[in-house]
């Protein structure tokens, strides 16, 4: 009798531990996968070559981020993700500094679910 009870308890524990990831966890992990040193380098290169102002650079950052996201997760998940981001304002936004007219992206502003991330802390 006690073996059956222990077995049932163990099954219940396994079921609760296997719950799906929350949207916040998915957003955080996707952001870390997409925004890397290479991604920031490409944004900074665009800023220098095209001499973008901060508004244009932010737009370029978001377009590139969303294209990588769409390519990575597909259109169905992308739609859910962007609806959530629009509702809760969790899009990653860049931090720029100005070097005599040339912008450099040095990191990502904190959002509801992620802390401030500097480019030196990103994956290579």
Swiss-Prot record:
Pfam families: RSV_NS2
Cell compartments where the protein resides: Host mitochondrion
InterPro entries: RSV_NS2 (IPR004336)
Family membership: Belongs to the pneumovirus non-structural protein 2 family.
Record-level GO cellular component terms: host cell mitochondrion
Name of the protein in question: Non-structural protein 2
Motif DLNP, residue range(s) on this chain: 121-124
Alphabetic keyword roster: Host mitochondrion, Host-virus interaction, Inhibition of host innate immune response by virus, Inhibition of host interferon signaling pathway by virus, Inhibition of host IRF3 by virus, Inhibition of host IRF7 by virus, Inhibition of host RIG-I by virus, Inhibition of host RLR pathway by virus, Inhibition of host STAT2 by virus, Inhibition of host TBK1 by virus, Inhibition of host TLR pathway by virus, Interferon antiviral system evasion, Modulation of host cell apoptosis by virus, Viral immunoevasion
Assembly description: Monomer (instable). Homomultimer. Heteromultimer with NS1. Interacts with host RIGI (via N-terminus); this interaction prevents host signaling pathway involved in interferon production. Interacts with host MAP1B/microtubule-associated protein 1B.
Function: Plays a major role in antagonizing the type I IFN-mediated antiviral response. Acts cooperatively with NS1 to repress activation and nuclear translocation of host IFN-regulatory factor IRF3. Interacts with the host cytoplasmic sensor of viral nucleic acids RIGI and prevents the interaction with its downstream partner MAVS. Together with NS2, participates in the proteasomal degradation of host STAT2, IRF3, IRF7, TBK1 and RIGI through a NS-degradasome involving CUL2 and Elongin-C. The degradasome requires an intact mitochondrial MAVS. Induces host SOCS1 expression.
Any one of the GO BP annotations: symbiont-mediated suppression of host cytoplasmic pattern recognition receptor signaling pathway via inhibition of RIG-I activity
Note on domains (UniProt): The DNLP motif has IFN suppressive functions like binding to host MAP1B.
């Amino acid at each position: 009798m006690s073996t059956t009870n222990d077995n049932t308890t163990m099954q219940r524990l396994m079921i609760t531990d296997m719950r799906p990831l929350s949207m916040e966890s998915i957003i955080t992990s996707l952001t870390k996968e997409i925004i890397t040193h290479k991604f920031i380098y490409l944004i900074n290169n665009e800023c220098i070559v095209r001499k973008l102002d901060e508004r244009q650079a932010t737009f370029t950052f978001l377009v590139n981020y969303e294209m990588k996201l769409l390519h990575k997760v597909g259109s169905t998940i992308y739609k859910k993700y962007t609806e959530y981001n629009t509702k809760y304002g969790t899009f990653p936004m860049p931090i720029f500094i100005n070097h005599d007219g040339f912008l450099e992206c040095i990191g990502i502003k904190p959002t509801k679910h992620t802390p401030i991330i500097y480019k030196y802390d990103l994956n290579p």
